[in-house]
Design a protein with these regions (language model features):
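Structural motif
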Residues: 36-41, 79-82, 119-123, 165-170, ...
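Non-catalytic accessory segments flanking enzyme active sites
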Residues: 16-20, 158-161, 167-168, 195-196, ...
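Blade-terminus and WD-like Trp-Asp/Gly-His loop motifs, strongest in beta-propeller folds
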Residues: 19-27, 62-71, 104-112, 116, ...
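Beta-strand-rich domains and repeat architectures in extracellular enzymes and scaffolds
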Residues: 7-41
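Multi-bladed beta-propeller domains
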Residues: 1-15, 43-59, 84-100, 124-146, ...
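Cap/lid segment of the alpha/beta-hydrolase catalytic domain
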Residues: 380-506, 510-512, 519, 554
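Active-site-proximal cap/loop segments of hydrolase catalytic domains
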Residues: 451-454, 467-662
């Protein structure tokens, strides 16, 4: 047996997604990423009868529990839709076809469900299978928001569509006579982007509205009969931009909404009475009540919310409840990261994802009723089966431009790989986003959890590994998130460079062998720092990073999000024609003539988050400059590569690169 984890061990780690309960609370389900895609994991709350559904073709893309029965829809990337019965452990194929479908959402009475087919809203009868497609504005090219459909109790269906290059919310009367001209009962208009519809008890539709280049956010309640709109929440920051995220959630009785807002400089739980429009901040303090970047508080009942918070430790997350009277109660304080809290229908049990220093993400449930809390592990981390325990991270701090920056260090001397060596190689890992945060242990998401797992492999090979939480990330307050506004590509890159210098200062690190790498914004930071701080790192590795900011901006505002919500100009300090020098300075391609060390690149051609043409920019520029580089492209691969074989090849090559550059 090997004395340290292998690449296969790294790739065997599974990543459960956010859990969801059946309507009766007898089952909960979550997708689990393994090998090349998601399977579906379903279990009872006691964990006595787990069931895994793996489709014969393709992988699970989404699932949706019926609102009335313990059945769920399961969609795959092979174009199939199943109705699954976890009690009988059966799956019935109810539709298939080459058309693109997505966003399955059950009606409140459980008799039908909506979805997009080739961009058009479709409603299907759950019993007869009869379908009706509505000839209304289409879904459009932009990425999904948290809610794409929302059903009212009287058969009105709200949905998101795209028109005039921005997102809108419209309402369909699904009971209108078949054959009539399909017209929207109500819709939003204007240049601002509207999304994430939900319904209030008084019949109004509530939704998120953003605009003015990321400077304005409002939560709107609209009367679909009169068109009258009320602003329930208003955020405006014309200098540095809005950095709040997460869709508002409606209370079970439909009279209140809750969301996480940084009104006092830190993300906290807020509730708004939909009738009086009175907003109440329920939590406060110099910490953030948010588990992951797009998280939002969840209703336990009409008077209580549950949420994740780093109030106990900036790099961890624990679960709490808060009443509308502002009384906060700890629910789960297990050391590590506890996120995605989902209360059971009876309010007595909480499902969530847990990860820590010794365990990769697991699905867990804890009792939240009065009495001694009990926790059950519904899935178990395969890290427990490794031949040696993982290296536990150490929180470290260093100064960057007068600011304290922190990160998490894996010291390989904790393992059996090395003893008191004084010439160990080192790696700085840069997360994406930038509104993300590396944690005190495994990250709950696959993207960063996989990187953390691989660095455990590197640490066992004798590499010192540092995860840097640079300016622009979450977990440290609004000012920290807004710190790169107007100076993108400068201040946060200084933080990355200082992380490299910190590693060089360690007496057991070889100062001539410190690498830097990252995915997405981490890839961008790698490309940028090699040109702006060419003497810090010995090699760079870029996965799906940005090289030309103006090229990216044009592509992103056509395919990812509307220009109304795009904060690219704000982050640059102006439009390209206003401050061309800033756009040039923020683009790594501008600085590639300064490269002094080799660069290795990996990118998938099917990337929906960073355009593949960015790799073309890198290759063309470095070829013309006669710089040392290498570039791999993976046909059809995603932003975070989906295939096990792709990651195996990438990780093996990264290891060879690090060894060769020592």
């Amino acid at each position: 047996m090997p004395l340290s984890p292998t690449i296969s061990d790294v790739l065997d780690v599974k990543y459960p997604g956010p859990p969801a309960w059946s309507a009766d609370g007898d089952f909960l389900a979550a997708t689990t990423y393994e090998d090349d895609g998601n399977s579906l994991f379903v279990t009872d709350p006691a964990g006595d009868s787990p069931w895994k559904f793996v489709p014969e073709e393709g992988h699970v893309t989404e699932f949706a529990w019926s609102t009335t029965t313990p059945e769920l829809l399961v969609a795959t990337d092979a174009g199939e839709l199943f109705l699954a019965d976890p009690d009988e452990r059966t799956t019935d194929l109810i539709r298939s076809g080459p058309e693109a479908t997505a966003s399955y959402t059950w009606s409140n009475d459980g008799t039908r469900f909506s979805f997009y087919r080739d961009g058009r809203p479709v409603v299907r009868d759950a019993t007869t299978g009869a379908e009706r497609s509505f000839d209304v504005p289409e879904r459009g090219p932009f990425l999904d928001e948290e809610r794409m459909f929302a059903w009212s109790d009287d058969a009105l269906l709200a949905y998101r569509f795209v028109e005039d290059d921005t997102t809108h919310v419209g309402v369909i009367d699904v009971n209108s006579a078949s054959g009539d001209t399909d017209e929207l009962v109500w819709r939003t208009r204007g240049e601002m982007a509207s999304s994430c519809p939900a319904w209030l008890a008084d019949g109004r539709v509530v939704f998120d509205r953003r605009g003015e280049g990321g400077r304005v956010r409002r939560t709107i309640a609209a009367d679909t009969e009169t068109g009258e709109e009320s602003v329930l929440v208003r955020e405006i920051d014309r200098e540095r931009g809005i950095v709040s995220s997460g869709a508002p959630t409606v209370s079970p009785d439909g009279t209140k909404i809750a969301l996480s807002l940084p009104m006092d400089g830190w993300d906290h739980v807020h509730v708004v009475d939909a009738e009086t429009e009175e907003r109440t901040q329920l939590t406060e303090g110099l910490f953030e009540d948010k588990g992951v970047a797009d998280a939002t508080p969840r209703w336990l009942d009409d008077e209580t919310l549950v949420f994740a918070s780093n109030r106990n430790d900036p790099g961890q997350r624990h679960l709490f409840s808060v009443s509308i009277d502002c009384e906060t109660t700890p629910l789960v304080e297990t050391p590590g990261t506890n996120v995605h809290p989902r209360p059971a229908p009876d309010g007595e049990t909480l499902a969530y994802v847990h990860a820590d220093r010794t365990r990769s993400p697991e699905l867990r449930v804890s009792s939240v009723a009065d009495g001694e809390p009990r926790t059950r592990r519904l899935t178990r981390s395969s890290v427990e089966e490794w031949p040696t325990p993982p290296v536990e991270p150490e929180r470290v701090e260093f100064e960057s431009a007068g600011r304290c920056i922190d990160g998490y260090l894996l010291d390989p001397r904790q393992s059996d790989a090395v003893d008191d060596a004084t010439d160990l190689p080192a790696v700085v890992c840069v997360h994406g986003g930038p509104m993300r945060q590396m944690r005190d242990g495994w990250h709950p998401s696959r993207a960063y959890g996989l990187f953390y797992t691989y660095h455990q492999y590197l640490a066992a090979k004798g590499y010192a590994c540092l995860f840097v939480n640079y300016r622009g990330g979450i977990g440290y307050g609004r000012e920290f998130r807004q710190a790169i506004a107007g100076s993108r590509g400068k201040d946060e890159i200084e933080d990355v460079a200082r992380a490299g210098e910190y590693l060089k200062s360690l007496d057991y690190v070889d100062a001539d062998s410190v690498a830097v790498w990252g995915l997405s914004y981490g890839g961008y930071a790698t490309l940028q720092v090699l040109g702006t701080h060419p003497d810090v790192f010995s090699v760079g590795i870029n996965l799906a990073g940005l090289a030309d900011m103006e090229l990216y901006r044009g592509w992103a505002e056509e395919t990812k999000y509307p220009a109304a919500v795009s904060a690219e100009a704000l982050r640059m300090g102006g439009e390209p024609w206003e401050v061309p020098e800033r756009w040039d300075e923020a683009s790594p391609a501008t600085h590639m003539a300064n490269y002094e060390v080799p660069l290795y690149n990996f990118h998938g051609t099917g990337d929906r988050y960073v355009n593949f043409e960015q790799l073309d920019v890198v290759v063309e520029a470095l070829t013309d400059l006669e710089k040392e580089f290498d570039a791999d492209h993976y046909p059809g691969e995603n932003h975070v590569f989906s295939k096990r074989a792709t990651w195996r090849r990438t990780f093996r090559k990264v290891e060879r690169v690090l060894e060769d550059e020592r």
